[in-house]
Amino acid sequence: MKKVPLVIGGKTLSSRFFIGTGRYPNPVVQNETIKASGAEVLTFAIRRINLEHPDEDAILQHLEGRTFQYLPNTSGANNAEEAIRIARLARAAGLSDWIKVEISVSEKTLLPDPVETLKATEALAKEGFTVLPYTSDDPILCKKLEEVGAAAVMPGASPIGTGLGILNPYNLGVIVEEASVPIIVDAGLGSASDVAKAMELGADGVLMNTAVAKAKDPVKMALAMKQAIEAGLLSYEAGRIPMKRYATASSQLDHLLSSHSKG
């Protein structure tokens, strides 16, 4: 199966790597890492941005001269009302009409609140936002988010920043199978093999921050993740062989033995 070009909110993206802008050791490393990733979509917490003067913001000013699709997120919001307010502020400041809805109530797990996420997604979609909600790996919830207007859905592989990888590949596979909008795997991916697995399961892309920013060499890790996306996508398009319980010889042993005995 060949993936069609990735289109979200009417925008065609050449890169399937979405990358976060936080937690890098310094702005130089941040810039070089983003460059190595080839990412077009950058996400950042709105609460960390100077909304009065976004062009002078310490996070965004180092990205001058390059064109990105900004994906502000509502990290820090505890309910739908807060997320909606934050999204409106970001749009009013001219950042973007793309918004990553991120609502959690537990500082320990940072797991997304399903009810509040659904409410915020529906409300913001009605206001004309291009909404990409961060959610759990629940196939039913992911489908409901799509139905209320999500432009793409972003299920977590595991809790944010844990690096635990894909805890429930079955659910992720079902989410992809049932979706009519792009699925971007978000949170918990820790290595290039995690990324390749997500793409092999049929994901349309991945969003990463901690696994890259906190790596010993963020620039190299960004390149590794970029190549893993490409490898995983190629593997998905090529179609893996079915898994079986018992072995199958790659050579026709019966035919070879029969020919040898006749000789």
UniProtKB/Swiss-Prot annotation:
Pfam families in the record: ThiG
Positions contributing to 1-deoxy-D-xylulose 5-phosphate binding: 161, 187-188, 209-210
Keyword set, alphabetical order: Cytoplasm, Schiff base, Thiamine biosynthesis, Transferase
One cellular component term from this protein's GO annotations in UniProt: cytoplasm
Gene3D superfamilies per UniProt: Aldolase class I
Residue positions of the active site: 100 (schiff-base intermediate with dxp)
Pathway: Cofactor biosynthesis; thiamine diphosphate biosynthesis
InterPro entries: Aldolase_TIM, Thiazole_synthase_ThiG, ThiG
Molecular-function GO terms, alphabetical: thiazole synthase activity
Reactions this protein catalyses: [ThiS sulfur-carrier protein]-C-terminal-Gly-aminoethanethioate + 2-iminoacetate + 1-deoxy-D-xylulose 5-phosphate = [ThiS sulfur-carrier protein]-C-terminal Gly-Gly + 2-[(2R,5Z)-2-carboxy-4-methylthiazol-5(2H)-ylidene]ethyl phosphate + 2 H2O + H(+)
Subcellular localization: Cytoplasm
Enzyme class: transferase
TM ranges: none
Protein EC: 2.8.1.10
Biological processes annotated in GO: thiamine diphosphate biosynthetic process
Disulfide bonds: none
Main subcellular location: cytoplasm
Family in the record: Belongs to the ThiG family.
PANTHER family named among the record's database cross-references: THIAZOLE SYNTHASE (PTHR34266:SF2)
Function: Catalyzes the rearrangement of 1-deoxy-D-xylulose 5-phosphate (DXP) to produce the thiazole phosphate moiety of thiamine. Sulfur is provided by the thiocarboxylate moiety of the carrier protein ThiS. In vitro, sulfur can be provided by H(2)S.
Subunit structure: Homotetramer. Forms heterodimers with either ThiH or ThiS.
Protein name according to UniProt: Thiazole synthase
Source organism: Shouchella clausii (strain KSM-K16)
